[in-house]
């Protein structure tokens, strides 16, 4: 498994705005990127920085996505830095869409 982290200037001014914007494109990431396991977006309102974390099944899948024109354009337009990591262990795993019982 491969972990990829992108850092860039915040895409939206608040976490609520980022959530509303990114929820529109979640289906693309769920269906159109081979080998992608999950992908959260994050923002830090205090620092004005944003991040995306990708988990891929393998390096070939990660490289295919990050070499795509869409990703190259995003990184160029947003001065994004990118770093790849081999995943050594996972501490906890559950679906994000799981409903919590009260």
Give the location of each predicted region.
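Short loop/helix-cap segments at secondary-structure boundaries that form the rim of catalytic
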Residues: 74
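Short S/T/G/P-rich N-terminal loop/turn motif that feeds into the first structured element of a domain
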Residues: 1-49, 57-67, 77-102
């Amino acid at each position: 498994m491969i972990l990829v982290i992108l850092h860039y200037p915040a895409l939206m001014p608040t976490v609520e705005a980022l959530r509303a914007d990114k929820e529109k494109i979640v289906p693309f990431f769920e269906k159109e990127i081979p080998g992608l396991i999950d992908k959260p977006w994050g923002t830090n309102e205090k620092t004005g920085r944003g991040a995306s974390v990708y988990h891929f099944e393998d390096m070939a899948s990660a490289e295919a996505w990050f070499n795509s024109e869409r990703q190259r354009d995003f990184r160029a337009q947003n001065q994004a830095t990118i770093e790849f990591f081999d995943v050594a262990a996972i501490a906890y795993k559950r679906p994000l869409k799981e409903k919590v019982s009260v």
